[in-house]
């Protein structure tokens, strides 16, 4: 049942809070690659050794081993194009944080090309997306909810335009039709955050 999710990190505040250095994106992606390499070794071998640019382990042990073989599914999440090579190398699922169907389709095509370069079957990797969902009973209800979320001097139309890459917005039927666009480009899982829900039991 375990699915192992990991990314390169993006929020500098979290790094500073826990005493980690916040390196540039390329370095963090290199660290991610080495981290997953070590983790996979430790899941499959009695003792693991690795020496990379960033990390080093000698006779490292993971016990007990995972039940899933050869190892638990690995979900790699992130938005940067530099991450795609790590996804192709290690991931069983690629989680896209936000993005319109058009943006994600371009990234999926890059992933296909990256898989081809290393002779990995692209079909082994599932694609998922993290989205915020704003749903109202009808169009008037949607406008009412947006009015409470938009910036002070921003129109409803401006809010919708600004948020289109991260929010599935509208009536239930609108949202369903929008999500179908993701399904059409190969998205198979949705991780959703509901925002702006009314307090009515019906909408919950």
Regions found by a protein language model. Give the residues of each.
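Active-site-adjacent structural elements that line small-molecule/cofactor binding pockets in enzymes
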Residues: 1-204
């Amino acid at each position: 049942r375990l699915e192992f999710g990991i990314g390169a990190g993006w929020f500098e505040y979290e790094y500073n809070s826990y005493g980690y250095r916040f390196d540039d994106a390329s370095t963090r992606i290199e660290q991610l690659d080495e981290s997953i390499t070590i983790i996979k070794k430790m899941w499959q071998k009695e003792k693991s050794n690795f020496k990379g640019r960033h990390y080093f382990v000698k006779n490292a042990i993971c016990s007990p081993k995972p039940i899933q073989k050869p190892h638990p599914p690995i979900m790699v999440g992130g938005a940067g194009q530099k991450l795609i090579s790590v996804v192709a190398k290690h991931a069983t699922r690629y989680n896209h944080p936000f993005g319109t169907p058009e943006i994600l389709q371009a990234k999926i095509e890059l992933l296909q090309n990256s898989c081809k370069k290393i002779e990995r079957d692209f079909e082994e990797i599932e694609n998922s997306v993290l989205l915020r969902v704003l749903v109202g009973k009808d169009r008037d209800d949607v406008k009412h909810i947006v009015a409470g979320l938009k910036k002070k001097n921003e129109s409803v139309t401006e809010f919708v335009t600004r948020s289109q890459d991260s929010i599935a917005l509208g009536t239930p039927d609108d949202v369903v039709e929008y999500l179908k666009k993701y399904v059409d480009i190969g998205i198979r899982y949705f991780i959703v955050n509901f925002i702006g829900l009314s307090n009515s039991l019906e909408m919950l």
